[in-house]
Amino acid sequence: AVIFTLDWHPGNHCSFAANGGQWPSHCVAYTQGAGLPDEFAGILASGKAKLFLKGQEQDKEQYGAFEDLATDSIEYAWLSNADSVDVCGIAGDYCVKASTENVLKVVAPEKVSILTDCVRSIDGGEALEAFINEKGITKK
């Protein structure tokens, strides 16, 4: 299974520094920089991948892509039927780590890998490395 997740924030999201949060404004819905690169359009159009949005609620910080994963959700079905799950993205110490924690509620650790060359962390990778070692996740 190929699953893409995107932050898709309203312009007044609570995580933004201008609204009292800790992050600069980023991934504002329908703006440049919020979407997937054009190179991914083909796999999405093929039906072999699924796109899920997160961070859409103005007053809720959401690091994990699957925080509120209900067993009857599309996300749960995709994850539970996956032969393997490779995780990558930004930021390794926040969203990638939290999303992987969410995935591990559904998928056994031996089926989960972190694509470390495709991850960037704010802390240089220390928190994610510790998490990978603690959970016994494979690095690719």
Model regions: which residues?
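Conserved phosphoryl-transfer catalytic core
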Residues: 1-5
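Active-site-adjacent betaalpha module
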Residues: 10-18, 24-140
